[in-house]
Amino acid sequence: MFGQINHFLFLLFSFFFPLSVALGNLLIIIISVLWLFSGKLKEKFHLIKANKFAMACIYFFVLHIISLLWTEDFYKGLERTKKMLEFGIYIPILLSFIKIKNIEKYLTMFLISIGIMVLTSYLIFFELIAPTKGSTINDPTPFMSHITYTPMIAIGFYLSSRFLLSMDSISMKNNKAMTIFLVFISISSFINVFMTEGRAGYVILFILLSLLFFQAFGTNLKAIFLSIVSIAIVFFAAYLSSPTFKQKIQSTFDVTNNFSNIQNSSIGKRLIMADISIEIFKENFLFGTGVGDFEDDYKKIMLKKKLNNEIYTDIASSTKNPHSFYLLVAAELGFVGLLFLGYLFFAHFKLALTHKSMFKKDILISIGICFLALNFSDSYFLGHFSSFLYLFFVSLLLSERA
């Protein structure tokens, strides 16, 4: 009975987590509580222990807990550690109960949610409805900021396209409704990416587009040629037809060309954050400062720099996030933290590459590459929507339950 209830709840989670943080959190907590009280804990823990990726997630989470021993601000550290519950608790739990036979249903529910997001975005763009909180007509990203929205929509494009690649002509004829739905999601989400201001999403879309060609034609010159040509065509078509995309590309070139004023740009501020984060890492190379201490350590170094160099005058004195998860882990958990994070990705790709299903193998590799790239530009493993997105895919596709 509990299995059926959790199956239904995860169907709801698959649909609601891209639309609502509150509902996503509520559903995952209920699923976890039911899992705990549904019995057969010994069997469940055995399944978790046998899954190398689940254990890699737990190791990374436990390192956060251990680092509380040397952090100076215990309560801030506790708050940071809570943001890693997806890795320490939720992913292992989901890996122990999700059944392979239900995976397609969960993915379909996710794509329906993507369809609602895209449709809402178009309605905002064409001024048929008022912009939702945080979105504008020029940046129609409902339910979340463009930092997370655009990569998620790009992944929606990839998933629907990969579904279409796996369908032969007979299955398309037999299930016309599903085929039409997938084509709609693929085309509408592809266009929608260039209607937003999410530069990270642009990069992810181009990466996923290339991967689709390699997954369709194999690793050969044809796939390389088609991916390069298609990216070039899409780039210039988007540049000529999308004012938002054009503006973001031009602003990026303007910043790089006007290097003397780079510190006042978003790119310049990120470079300064990176510089200070590396200083913190060098001072605490092996184990880091401990989770939760980054903001205070950053502030100390920034105040010194402001006294010695006027270019830092207009830069914010503190930040909780250096806009790179790797820099944050390096500063807070040191070289050991980077090793644990590296092992997490290693386990992800190792299990992906040995997966028996080509469909799941392709998606796992693509999701892994996406999050490897995304975490350079921001701390995507800390955001509610983005961490749930990663949780969703790895829990489904790395589950070994029949």
Regions from the language model: what does each represent?
Residues 6-13, 54-56, 181, 185, ...:
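Loop-to-helix entry and N-terminal half of a specific, functionally important transmembrane alpha helix
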Residues 30-36, 209, 341-344, 364-376, ...:
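Transmembrane alpha-helices of multi-pass inner-membrane enzymes
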Residues 65, 102-135, 144-217, 226-240, ...:
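Alpha-helical transmembrane segments of multi-pass inner-membrane proteins
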Residues 1-79, 95-111, 163-180, 222-226, ...:
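Transmembrane signal-anchor hairpin modules in multi-pass inner-membrane enzymes, especially those
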Residues 261-275, 283, 287-333:
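Long extracytoplasmic/lumenal interhelical loops at the membrane interface
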Residues 195-196, 216-261, 273, 278-283, ...:
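A membrane-periplasm/extracellular boundary helix in multi-pass inner-membrane enzymes
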Residues 14-31, 45-51, 62-87, 97-105, ...:
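Interfacial transmembrane-helix termini
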Residues 168, 213-214, 223-225, 332-372:
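Hydrophobic transmembrane alpha-helices and their immediate junctions
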